[in-house]
């Protein structure tokens, strides 16, 4: 059962950097719903994308799976035989709960839940890959290599779903959407102290990119088509397609 996120409701003397530890994992469903505008829409639409792109006899990768929300969404709309989902996260606390969540919902498509580093996982025979608010936690210098690996592991006609928090090249727009995001969190019951403390912990570990930067990386990796398909304030999701005639 998910608990309400009150992790930052009292002053913390030494904040440190953000980690996806046991305390975060325990309140994560509540935290992400109250912090990420449009999160439920993205999860629901990932299921629709899976129905369109997952092919028989292929694999789906959920890289940075957290508690498995995207994995479960994908699995609901897989109607082919011999498919498998591989869900990976480097947080032991997240993986422990993810396994419980996956096991609670029976379905014919098997799921391998792996505790590991997504940079070390081989991507093979993939028809769909999901990076749901994950890339932003990698060092910027490591992001291109991961996208290159995903492109190489995708079958022709495959899709990558890349959801992220965005920065903006237009400072005025960036400021507006930043403030609207904070209004969203206030409306969901977070205090100024909670918002400030969480932001301080995240600022050194979550480094955001613009949509233009994401699209440039995807093009460099080999994706012929990529576009923003969902956005709410400074959060959104892109889909990148590998050409059906790609070698």
Swiss-Prot record:
- EC code(s) of this entry: 2.1.3.-
Molecular function terms, GO-annotated: carboxyl- or carbamoyltransferase activity; S-adenosyl-L-methionine binding
User: What are the GO BP annotations of this UniProt entry?
Assistant: tRNA wobble uridine modification
Which reaction equations make up its catalytic activity? Answer: prephenate + S-adenosyl-L-methionine = carboxy-S-adenosyl-L-methionine + 3-phenylpyruvate + H2O
The EC class name is: transferase
- Per its UniProt record, what InterPro entries does this chain match? CmoA, Methyltransf_25, SAM-dependent_MTases_sf
Name the keywords, alphabetized: S-adenosyl-L-methionine, Transferase
Q: Which Pfam families match?
A: Methyltransf_25
Q: What does the entry list as the binding residues for S-adenosyl-L-methionine?
A: 39, 64-66, 89-90, 117-118, 132, 199
Q: Which family does it belong to?
A: Belongs to the class I-like SAM-binding methyltransferase superfamily. Cx-SAM synthase family.
What role does this protein play? Catalyzes the conversion of S-adenosyl-L-methionine (SAM) to carboxy-S-adenosyl-L-methionine (Cx-SAM).
Q: Which NCBIfam families match?
A: carboxy-S-adenosyl-L-methionine synthase CmoA, PRK15451.1
- Quaternary structure? Homodimer.
Report the protein name in the record: Carboxy-S-adenosyl-L-methionine synthase
Gene name tied to this protein: cmoA
């Amino acid at each position: 059962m998910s608990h309400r996120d009150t992790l930052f409701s009292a002053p913390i003397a030494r904040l440190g950097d953000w980690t996806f530890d046991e305390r975060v994992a325990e309140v994560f469903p509540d935290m992400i719903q109250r912090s990420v505008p449009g999160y439920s829409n993205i999860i629901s639409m990932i299921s629709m994308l899976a129905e369109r792109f997952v092919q028989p006899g292929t694999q789906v990768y959920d890289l940075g799976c957290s508690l498995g929300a995207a994995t479960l969404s994908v699995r609901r709309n897989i109607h082919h035989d011999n498919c498998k989902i591989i869900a990976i996260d480097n947080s032991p606390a997240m993986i422990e709960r993810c396994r419980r969540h996956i096991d609670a919902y029976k379905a014919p498509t098997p799921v391998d839940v792996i505790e590991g580093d997504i940079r070390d996982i081989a991507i093979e025979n993939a028809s769909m890959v999901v990076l749901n608010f994950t890339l932003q936690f990698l060092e910027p210098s490591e992001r291109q290599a991961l996208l290159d690996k995903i492109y190489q592991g995708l079958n022709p006609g495959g899709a990558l779903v890349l959801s992220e928090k965005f920065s903006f090249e237009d400072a005025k727009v960036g400021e507006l959407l930043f403030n609207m995001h904070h209004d969203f969190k206030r409306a969901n019951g977070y205090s100024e102290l909670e918002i400030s403390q969480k932001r301080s912990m995240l600022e050194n570990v979550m480094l955001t990119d613009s949509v233009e930067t994401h699209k440039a990386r995807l093009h460099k990796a080999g994706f012929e088509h990529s576009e923003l398909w969902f956005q709410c304030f400074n959060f959104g999701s892109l889909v990148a397609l590998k050409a059906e005639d790609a070698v």
